[in-house]
């Protein structure tokens, strides 16, 4: 899964988990702004906005933050956000996928080039890395809310395909992208807490690296994750 490697120590994983939580909040706010730009600021008539506001509340984003960004989104000066995907090869044949949501694609592309110049790797043509990954739906279930055995039983009953427990904070219930909404609703009906649901990339095979190569890849991945516009970085390093 994204962000997990045997070359990352416990402190490193904790720092990255905290960083990822901040990225999740940031992406939700960008999704909120995008929803307003596309469908207007009234959640009663904008179903997508209504869904994202609920997601923000589920993530414990303060109401004042939500209201402030609703006003911000209604401003003519606020640009809309676009989703962009970049593909890279790191060291030792490791594939990397970067997902970003940006209001300035030129800025994001420049930041990606800087990352490669500073930390190595190579940006490649679309499709060059994606074939090593599968697109999946994922429901994020807090680990403190349920034990793994119970969730596994619920997952099977609800139409999920697999349960990933690698994340420090969440179980990920995986399913086909087209089944994500129905799997989430079925889990909620069984009393399972779903903090977030989204589409992710899952590696089809993992690439083994020696220690030096692994650490070089982690340095590149960290740099990519710290780009402001970047929301997710996926890799297939073991």
From Swiss-Prot:
State the Pfam families in the record. Answer: TACO1_YebC_N, Transcrip_reg
Which keywords accompany this UniProt record? Cytoplasm, DNA-binding, Transcription, Transcription regulation
Where does the signal sequence lie? none
Q: What are the subcellular locations of this protein? A: Cytoplasm
User: Which example biological process does GO assign this protein?
Assistant: regulation of DNA-templated transcription
For molecular function, the Gene Ontology terms on record are: DNA binding
- UniProt KW Transcription keyword: yes
- What are the Basic residues biased-composition ranges? 9-21
Name used for this protein in its record: Probable transcriptional regulatory protein CT_457
Q: What InterPro entries does this protein map onto?
A: Integrase-like_N (IPR017856), TACO1_YebC-like_2nd/3rd_dom (IPR048300), TACO1_YebC_N (IPR049083), Transcrip_reg_TACO1-like (IPR002876), Transcrip_reg_TACO1-like_dom3 (IPR026564), YebC-like (IPR029072)
Q: From which source organism is this entry?
A: Chlamydia trachomatis serovar D (strain ATCC VR-885 / DSM 19411 / UW-3/Cx)
